[in-house]
């Protein structure tokens, strides 16, 4: 912000600047459609059985802050979906709560974008899918909508037959 202010003064356009806000900076924009939360060791911390609950909560809060910042910058209220029973679900619940709180405040960052009011169309809202990194998304993307290619890869299907060992293994 200091560089921006210095450049504005040097260029003589500082009189045109009405307001600069230092908020919603919980992410780093790398490209038009790519951003980074710049969180180190997040995966290790969230999957370490010895991790303190306070550290896990702090990590989840950091992820939520970054995602909220990105949504607020875009001015869009996403439809949030996550897998159940893990860090992704905890992030989804906290993010949903933070967005609801912001929507109930005056001057919220989503006033120009989609609203989360009853009767609003979810078609016009972006979809935010949260997955745990342990979730194997590639199998779903690489295989057709039928189970045959998946069965062929996983269960060694030969001549349209599959032998399944049921001896408890």
Named regions from a protein language model:
Residues 1-169:
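Extended, well-folded catalytic/binding cores that form a central cleft or groove in large enzyme
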